[in-house]
Amino acid sequence: MEVTSGSGITVRQPILKAVRPVSNHPSGGFFGAKATGENFARLLEAHPTYIHPASSLCGVYMVSFMSCRQPEWNPDFDYSHLHKAQTRYGIDHGIGGVQHFCPDLNIGLKLGWGGLADKIRHHRQLNPPAAGFYDGLEAVVAGIRDWIRRHAKDARQIARRQDDPTLRENLEAMAGICERIATQPPRTFREACQWLVFFQAAAKMYN
């Protein structure tokens, strides 16, 4: 389907038919941090794992969250007065695109997913009026952690069926790494690389 990319350009994206976003708006769309975070978690829940026995890292992204967001822009905020100029000048306006961001990866590598979850809970208590914002963040982090745990489970299952001892050992190591980084910050170079793979896959999936 055609969607607006994070750069505001119309692109074609595959969809996961198992994903059923929950709307919080009469248009059938969903808007706001809480609904967006919870629906992104639903996408992660449906997203397949990817494990190759000969790779030292697992996890990829296969779809874009934008394919779940229809409409992409809240129709309560009308911009029809801009349509004429947009058409005249062939403007790719980007309205409805989620845009890109530049995260401080050191925070994630230092805290790990468990530490990020703790930080969200801490700041929720300090900012009661922003409950919906923290609901969305918690849903995303919980969804990513579950996605990582599914990789650990699948890697162990593949390892049990693997006859080659080297590949089996690699798969078991991969599973152990995933089990650990789902809750703890990475300790080794390989664990840090695996943490970054999951973060980048989730970030790319989002926008």
Regions found by a protein language model. Give the residues of each.
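Structured, charged N-terminal subsegments at the starts of enzyme catalytic cores
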Residues: 117-207
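Long, non-catalytic protein-protein interaction scaffolds
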Residues: 1-126
